[in-house]
Amino acid sequence: MPELVDWRRDPAVARGARGATSKEWATHVHELWRVLARLDADDYDEDEDGKDVAGDAEAARTTSSRIRLPYPAVVPGERFRETYYWDTYWIVLGLLTSEMPATALGVTNNLLYMVTTYGFVPNGARVYYLNRSQPPLLSSCVSAVYEATRDAEWLRQALPLLVQEYAYLTRSERTITVRDTESGEVHALSRYFANTTRPRPESYREDVEVARRATRRLEDAVAKLDVKRKIYRHLASAAESGFDFSSRWLADGKNLETIHTCDMIPADLNGFMLRVETDIARLAREALVSLPVSEDEIYAERVYLNHLLEKFTRASEVRRRAIDAVLWDDDTKRWRDVTFEPLVGEDARAVVRDVGELVFACETPYVSDFTPLWCGALDAGSERAYEVVEALRTSKLVTAKGIATSLVESGQQWDWPNAWAPSTHMLVEAIQLYAPREEKYAKELAHSWLRTAYQAWKSTGFMHEKYDVCDDADSVGKGGEYVPQRGFGWTNGVTLRLLEQYGFPDDSVNCVE
C-alpha cells in the first residue's frame, strides 16, 4: 500500500469521536487515503487497454494517457484512477481534517502545475481532458491549504497562477454579455464551453449514439454534421460542469439529444466565478500583509499585489451585481440558470443580449440554484440569505436521507433521487456562514447525510460516489453513464469534515452511539 509522508494512525477526528461508531467510521475513512494515493507518475496499475503494467515504469509512460504530475495524488477511486479537478477541493478538506497538510499541499500543487503547463486546470489528469476544465475551485484549494499552513511564500507563488487560470475562465467564448435595459448596465457572465466538436474519447460510443438520435430525422448531410458537432460540444461542456449529466442541460428535461449546455448561463458557475474573484482579492491582501516592510526589492511585488487586490475586489463587486440582476429570481428566492437563443452563425464574443431575451431554464429547483449563497452572493446575516435558506427548506429537495440534486426523475445521475457529497457540504457551510441563526438546520442537513453515508458503508463495506435518498436498502446512488463507483475521494473528505464539525448523529435507528 502506498505510504504518504504525513499519514498517521488515529487522527484528531477519530481521537475526538464521542462514541465507538464515529471512531470506527472516521478511522476507516482516514485509512482510505492510503488506498486512493498515487505516489508518483509511474504509480499505475494498468495501461489504456487494461494490461497490467504495475512496476513497469516505461510501459506506463508509453501506453498511458495520464498527465504525469510532480507530487503524490489522491484520486476519487475505481474508474476514476487519476486526479480530477473539482473533486480535489473536497479531498483537500478531508486531508486537512486528517492532519495531512503536506499531502493536501501536494495535490494542490499538482493543479497549479497543470496551470503552469497548460494555462488552466483540465477536467482531469488525462491528455484527452485538455479541451475542457471543471468547476473552478483551485482558488478554494489554495485558500484551504494556506489557512492550514500559513506559508506566505508559497501563497505569493500561487497567486499569479490563479490569475492565469482566471484569464482562461474569462475568455471571450466563455463569456455572455447581457444588457440590463432598465439600468443600462452591461454584465459579463460565464458559461461552460468545451473546446471540442468531437465525441469525448472516454465516452465515445455513448456520444456517437446521442448524436445519431439527435440527427435521425435530418437528411441534409451538412445540416446533420453541424448538429452533431454542436451536440458533441454541449455534451463535453456538460461534463465540464461536473453535472454530467442532468436534466438541467436538457431542453425537454429528459432526453440527452436535446442537450444545450452552451446556450445557458449557469447559476452555480457564476457563483464559483464570484468565489474565485473574492478569493484572489483576499489572498492578495494576505500576501501583502506577509511582505517585509522595509525591503526595497519587494517593491514591485507590493505593487503587483495591490493591483490584484484592487482588480479582483472590483471584479467581485461587478460579478455580484450581474448575478443579482440576471440570475436571481425574486419570486422563488433562489438563483436560477437562464437560457438564451443562439443566433445562426453568431460570434458570441460580439453579441450583447438584452436581459429580456433570457429565460429561466427550469421551473423546478436544483441543488445548484443555491450554490451562489456558498460563494458569497449575499451578505452574511442578511434578510435575503435567510430567504434563500427558507426556499431550500421548502424546495422538496431536502429529505430525511439527504439533499437530492433535483426533483426530476430523468435517469441521469445528477437528478432525483441522488444526493452528492459536494452539494451537501456547500449548502451546510453556506448556512453556517451566511445564515448563522439557522445553524441548527445546517446540523440537521449534515446529520441526515452522515446517516445515509454510514448506512451505505455498513451495508456494503464501501464509501460511494453518490447516495439514493429513496433507497432504504443500501442507499447507493445509481443512474447515468456508468455503474455506481466506490472509493470515494470527495465523499471521504466531506464525511471527515462533517464528523469533525458536527459529530455523528445520535438519533439514527441503526447508528446509535
Which residue stretches match the model-derived regions?
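Amphipathic, well-ordered alpha-helical segments in soluble domains
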Residues: 87, 103, 107-110, 134-137, ...
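Aromatic/His-enriched, Gly/Pro-containing loop or helix-boundary segments
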Residues: 115-158
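Extended, well-ordered alpha-helical scaffold segments
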Residues: 100-111, 151-170, 276, 290-324, ...
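Long, repeat-rich segments with strong aromatic
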Residues: 260-287, 413-436
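Short glycine/serine- and small hydrophobic-enriched flexible loop segments
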Residues: 93-97, 140-147, 275-286, 374-377, ...
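Acidic/aromatic-lined carbohydrate-recognition and catalytic surfaces
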Residues: 140-191
